[in-house]
């Protein structure tokens, strides 16, 4: 039984592989080992675009600057004695000109039976990666161009490029074949360059605030720090069940105990749950913890961090347009301070329900009549859980401008201190929302080991009553660390993929992940 790979049957692939054989028969290695001492195309443009270089005649006389660079051939047209191409390198392009009497092909023998210009026109294809040396000049229209003296084939492409105008129209193909998407779409390249810059800016800001970047284990013997279903695997060497982390929290708090007063980690987190427009099972987070802070300090840090990023990306401006809300395009201002209100206040303002005026059975009735939640999600819910459900259903998608929603019900987390005012039904937790989605989760961290054990054990009792619940097992090492003594602290977690979505006007989380999780496609079998 053989497996049929679709692209191997394409006419274009077969045609290009025949060219590949012809190139090898000419004594040219189509996949050489290196091409060094190159400038990047953007460097060339930056250095020479405003210079007085002269015209093509000066280039033919070799009187203009000589450059050496490499990139992918993305456009080509033959015009008799001259042929013109466009080379893409990272996110920069430059025009090149091949001349019948001037341009040579590296490795092509004089008696090969084919001239250099014919080799360029007949044996090269769009998508080939080339090394080029030549002389700079400006065309009559002012286009910076390289008169190519020598072209070196660095990689023969065997699959044609996507259409230069349509690109990859099928979103699923774009996500599966991101390499082709990046080649064909300048907007896609810009999105991922912005993502990389956002990561750099996060580190820049956190370093300025005296935080230490650390790395903690991805494989864990016990999972915790969030309410989520883990991925489970087996460590063969120890015959032990292991989990991919669902949060960075517990390990970072252990470092606080160890005397590292400000720590953060940017890393992958894994949750074996649903896939939708804003969720991918593998995603990137930053979590940070600062000794001697509380959630008020963290609020300032979070909004200042995001404002810092937005200003850096937008020439000092704090406003960003987002186009993918059901209500239509919105302009959001990330300038600090952000709107702050308690969860109860937000339900009153945006949901029209003052929860303090309603008994539990009345809150259940509101959930029944004003939401599409199944009855089982709230019929046995505690008062705090009912309040959290009302917020999720009536408020979240209305939080377009940046909001900090504070003072959540105790039932929403076991890792947070109760309100210092003495109301033990609420905790010093806030979540930051923007464009109808959660962006950040943060606490005044609980450091009382006895209270922490009590809350975790209460979660375990709930788990026993509902085996399908997401409450995590107790981490005894974490409790032991708390007994050693953890300073008062504030901490936060931000979903970086979702932040990138907001700042690049992306409709889906898949648009900001190089390789999002996709359903596997089985190869055809004979």
Swiss-Prot record:
Subcellular location: Cytoplasm
Gene Ontology MF terms: ATP binding; lysine-tRNA ligase activity; magnesium ion binding; tRNA binding
Gene3D superfamilies linked: Bira Bifunctional Protein, Domain 2, Nucleic acid-binding proteins
EC number, as in UniProt: 6.1.1.6
Cellular-component GO terms for this entry: cytoplasm; cytosol
Binding residue positions for Mg(2+) 2: 438
Keyword Cell membrane found: no
Keyword Magnesium: yes
Recorded family membership: Belongs to the class-II aminoacyl-tRNA synthetase family.
Protein name: Lysine--tRNA ligase
Organism: Chlamydia trachomatis serovar D (strain ATCC VR-885 / DSM 19411 / UW-3/Cx)
